[in-house]
Each structure stands twice: as C-alpha cells, then as structure tokens.
UniProtKB/Swiss-Prot annotation:
InterPro entries: Chaperonin_GroES, Chaperonin_GroES_sf, Chaprnonin_Cpn10_CS, GroES-like_sf. The keyword Cytoplasm applies. One of its GO terms (biological process) is chaperone cofactor-dependent protein refolding. It comes from Alkaliphilus oremlandii (strain OhILAs). It is found in: Cytoplasm. Gene3D superfamilies: GroES chaperonin (2.30.33.40). Together with the chaperonin GroEL, plays an essential role in assisting protein folding. The GroEL-GroES system forms a nano-cage that allows encapsulation of the non-native substrate proteins and provides a physical environment optimized to promote and accelerate protein folding. GroES binds to the apical surface of the GroEL ring, thereby capping the opening of the GroEL channel. Belongs to the GroES chaperonin family. This is Co-chaperonin GroES. One of its GO terms (cellular component) is cytoplasm.
Length: 94
C-alpha cells in the first residue's frame, strides 16, 4: 500500500462484518451495519498539531475500535480504506 497519512491521521481497513446472525439468518449487504473494528494499515508521523505535540499511539497491524461516523472513506487499488484522526480511535484490541 502506498497511502502515507499526514500529521495525526491513520489509515485503517475495516474488518468485515458477519453476514449471518447467530440464529442463522443471512443478512443482505444493505442490512449489515458498518463494523467499527479495523486494522491499522498506515500511521502518520504525528508532530505538532494546533500547537500541541501529538505522539502516535497506534502502529501498523494494530486492531482498533473507532468512532462510528469518523473519517473519510477512500478506495485505492480496488480496496476500501478509511482515513481518520488518531483521536477518533477509541481503543486498541489486544
């Protein structure tokens, strides 16, 4: 991947949502909710943002939970990614 985020931004790739419920019902694409779990694909350098030093706390390969309506969705080489600010990441899943 050749997307290089700037500042405190992070590029993530969403983890696919379940297509079948626990009771066995198959969900059509339109009924599936966008997952809030993703893998970090690229991390910006951080630095001074609006007068405050920002240290990047996530790294490539981390699994993260992020705010539901955060970021900008982009398609690159046929793959969908989301670019968001580190502050929109709520937790790292270990």
């Amino acid at each position: 991947m050749n997307i290089k985020p700037l500042g405190d931004r992070v590029v993530i790739k969403r983890v696919e949502a379940e297509e079948t419920t626990k009771s066995g019902i198959v969900l059509p694409g339109s009924a599936k909710e966008q997952p809030q779990l993703a893998e970090v694909m690229a991390v910006g350098p951080g630095g001074v943002i609006e007068g405050k030093e920002v240290v990047m706390e996530v790294k490539v390969g981390d699994k993260v939970i992020f705010s539901k309506y955060a970021g900008t969705e982009v398609k690159f080489d046929g793959v969908e990614y989301t670019i968001l600010k580190q502050s929109d990441i709520l937790a790292v899943v270990e």
